């Protein structure tokens, strides 16, 4: 049953996320704006403007006080989730920012880029701490492990990489998708990784060994988004 339809954007919406307490929803759109919605009523509470091109990815900070956004305008912006004010703009990118995520402790931001790299940023200073090189195509999805010690990234080239979040070293490369990887996520306990791909499949991987445990088939087109349920027993895909 569809409970709500949130209308307000004037272009497609490539990214949505719930606030940690579940009371709000944030959406990023091709209309260059970010909207904050009341999750219960569906009312648009705020429209955040400042990006010059499409907003590709949005995420809440773990404490729910901030929102980050990545855009085709080659910037990441940090916003105050209550006031809607832009607190910081992280610059220095040469390509689109396709994916953003917070570390579990909220002190770092990671971004996946059109230049085949992943960047790690300090949220307080706005300084780029590390650039992770190794992918051979756009990095479409990034995520931290629940304990914050590892980073995963999925590339349009078809590979998934596991990185040491402190050193930036590539620990493993997971290969098995026949086309680009559009979405990656860790299980809540950090033992598994799921990936959605242009090859219409979802794969479940062992996060320690890198072994592909299962391939889930059933979609008739590409899988652009995957996520685990909070208890780790279910997977949703779109």
Model-found features: residue ranges?
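A detector of tandem-repeat and repeat-rich interaction/domain scaffolds
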Residues: 1-238
């Amino acid at each position: 049953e569809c409970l709500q339809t949130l209308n307000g954007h004037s272009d497609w919406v490539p990214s949505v996320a719930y606030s940690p307490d579940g009371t709000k929803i944030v959406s990023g759109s091709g209309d260059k704006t970010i909207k904050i919605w009341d999750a219960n009523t569906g009312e648009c509470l705020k429209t955040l403007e400042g990006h010059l091109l499409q907003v590709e990815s949005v995420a809440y900070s773990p404490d729910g006080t901030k929102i980050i956004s990545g855009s085709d305008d080659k910037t990441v912006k940090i916003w105050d989730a209550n006031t809607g004010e832009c607190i910081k703009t992280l610059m220095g990118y040469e390509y689109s920012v396709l994916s953003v995520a917070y570390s579990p402790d909220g002190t770092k931001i990671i971004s996946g880029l059109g230049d085949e790299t992943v960047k790690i940023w300090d949220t307080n200073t706005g300084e780029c701490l590390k650039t992770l090189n190794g992918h051979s195509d756009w990095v479409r999805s990034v995520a931290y492990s629940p304990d914050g010690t590892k980073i995963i990234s999925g590339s349009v080239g078809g590979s998934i990489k596991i990185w040491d979040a402190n050193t930036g070293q590539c620990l493993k490369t997971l290969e098995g998708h026949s086309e680009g990887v559009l979405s990656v996520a860790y299980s809540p306990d950090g033992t598994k990784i799921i990936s959605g791909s242009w090859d219409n499949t979802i794969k479940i991987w062992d996060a320690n060994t890198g072994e592909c445990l299962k391939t889930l088939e059933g979609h008739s087109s590409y899988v652009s988004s995957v996520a685990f349920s909070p208890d780790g027993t279910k997977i949703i895909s779109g």
